[in-house]
């Protein structure tokens, strides 16, 4: 899934120069082509999920459309307050992409499992879940 996702990002970014990609220290073995092709439009925010979402909100406020990508609990639950306050309450076009959403994330343990992501996101104002 990650390789196909990376290719769809490349296809979209080729057509829309206002798109940016922000990841929470993920992407090895899948996103290297995105990083190589789009350089300054690819941001590795590191293990700083709240900051990653706030940076995305600021970029959206300035006219960009950020895609924020991480393992599901780190793009939904960990930065939940920033999603609510910085993204939803301002109705900003930030796209949150959670890898492994809606189910357990294998052997990585309970911190990487996220069975409640869809429910948590659906109750936020102006949030759309696909």
What are these model-predicted stretches?
Residues 1-130:
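Thiamine diphosphate
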């Amino acid at each position: 899934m990650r390789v196909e996702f990376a290719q769809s990002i490349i296809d979209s970014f080729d057509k829309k120069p206002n798109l940016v990609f922000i990841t929470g220290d993920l992407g090895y073995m899948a996103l290297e082509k995105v990083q190589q092709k789009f350089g300054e439009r690819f941001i590795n925010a590191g293990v700083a999920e709240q900051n990653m979402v706030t940076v995305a909100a600021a970029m959206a406020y300035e006219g960009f459309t950020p895609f924020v990508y991480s393992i599901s609990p780190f793009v939904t639950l960990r930065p939940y307050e920033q999603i609510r306050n910085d993204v939803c309450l301002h109705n900003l076009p930030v796209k949150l992409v959670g890898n492994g959403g809606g189910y357990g994330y294998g052997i990585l343990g309970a911190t990487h499992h996220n069975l409640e992501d869809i429910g948590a996101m659906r109750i936020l104002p102006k949030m759309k879940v696909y």
